[in-house]
């Protein structure tokens, strides 16, 4: 091996080591930003930069004010940043209204400080806000569904970065468990109904599901802590979603939110119950989360918790 080859190999190793030392929270923020940029450049799904500005400003201002009031200091605002982008992408109001972005942003962040058990919030903030909006104003608010299409190049970029970052943040097992559960359950549902299988599986490549599997069900602050129970809870969420879809197929009188976004509704129903049981069993009285590798060990717990988001979506 020549001197040039050795030098190139050392450079590659140095860059790899630097990448491994990057705080995972910045990787998550990068991924949601990538989703936003790709979605806007390719499909113009934002619908107006005033929506993005309003959601981001409201999320970050609410986080700053409530954290200062609750903890005496302004915490890291990365979680608010991720929530603001997720809301901008997912919320689709009628008539170009802006109020759902302001209200949704406030509800998302406020839920972290109000809906708590033993100093831990129970809902993924973005998930809570979107389902709350759909329940309160189903005729005024909808969610992003198929507006991206299933373009191979777009999905390849997002899924490649998403899977790599999920592996780096040590939540890949949750993402893959949900995807596998979704594929199996929806294939069985299609067979039972005598429908083609592929149309029932296609939604997993849509934008809402990409935000859901990379940011919401993997949120470190709202998932249960033991790995074996993480598998169990993710499967239960997928089962609940499948049951909501079956109920919708049968014409049961479900809330519009459950028909419009069964995955979000399933997490909204199952996630906080699982987290509450986890906290109650452990006797945890301080903010708890699934550990993320790479976070500085000396970082104050409050800052570290508020900065992390695994969820449109946080």
Describe the role of every protein-language-model region.
Residues 1-68:
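N-terminal signal-anchor module of multipass membrane proteins
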Residues 8-31, 185-300, 310, 314:
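C-terminal transmembrane helix-loop-helix hairpin of multi-pass membrane proteins
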Residues 12-14, 60-72, 107-121, 160-170, ...:
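C-terminal ends of transmembrane helices
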Residues 42, 136-188, 194-195:
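Internal active-site segments that recognize and position negatively charged phosphoryl groups
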Residues 43-58, 90-104, 140-156, 197-210:
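Structural signature of hydrophobic alpha-helical transmembrane segments
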Residues 51-63, 79-88, 100, 104-108, ...:
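Alpha-helical transmembrane segments in multi-pass membrane proteins
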Residues 72-149:
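Membrane-interface helix-loop-helix junctions at boundaries between adjacent transmembrane segments
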Residues 80-93, 127-141, 156-159, 179-190, ...:
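Small-residue-rich segments of transmembrane alpha-helices in multi-pass membrane proteins
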């Amino acid at each position: 091996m020549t001197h040039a080859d050795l030098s190139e190999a050392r450079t590659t190793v140095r860059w790899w080591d630097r990448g491994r030392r990057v705080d995972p929270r910045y990787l998550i923020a990068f991924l949601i930003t990538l989703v936003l940029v790709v979605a806007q450049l390719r499909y113009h799904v934002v619908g107006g930069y005033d929506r993005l500005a309003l959601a981001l400003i409201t999320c970050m201002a609410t986080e700053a004010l409530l954290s200062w009031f609750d903890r005496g200091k302004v915490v890291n605002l990365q979680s608010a940043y991720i929530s603001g982008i997720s809301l901008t992408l997912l919320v689709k109001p009628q008539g170009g209204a802006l109020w759902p972005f302001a209200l949704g942003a406030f509800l998302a962040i406020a839920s972290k400080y109000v809906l708590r058990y033993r100093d831990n919030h129970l809902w993924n903030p973005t998930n809570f806000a979107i389902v709350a909006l759909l329940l309160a104003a189903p005729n005024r608010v909808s969610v992003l569904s198929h507006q991206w299409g299933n373009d191979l190049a777009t999905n390849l970029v997002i899924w490649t970065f998403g899977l790599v970052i999920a592996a780096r943040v040590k939540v890949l097992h949750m993402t893959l468990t949900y995807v596998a559960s979704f594929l199996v359950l929806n294939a069985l549902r299609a067979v039972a109904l005598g429908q083609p299988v592929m149309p029932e599986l296609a939604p997993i490549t849509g934008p809402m599901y990409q935000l859901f599997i990379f940011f919401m069900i993997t949120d470190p602050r709202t998932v249960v802590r033991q790995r074996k129970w993480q598998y169990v809870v993710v499967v239960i969420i997928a089962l609940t979603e499948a049951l909501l879809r079956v109920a919708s197929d049968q014409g049961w009188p479900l809330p519009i939110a459950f028909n419009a976004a069964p995955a979000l509704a399933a997490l909204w129903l199952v996630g906080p119950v699982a987290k509450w049981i986890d906290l109650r069993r452990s006797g945890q009285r301080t903010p708890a989360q699934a550990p993320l590798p790479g976070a500085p060990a000396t970082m104050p717990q409050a800052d570290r918790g508020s900065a992390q988001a695994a969820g449109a979506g946080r």
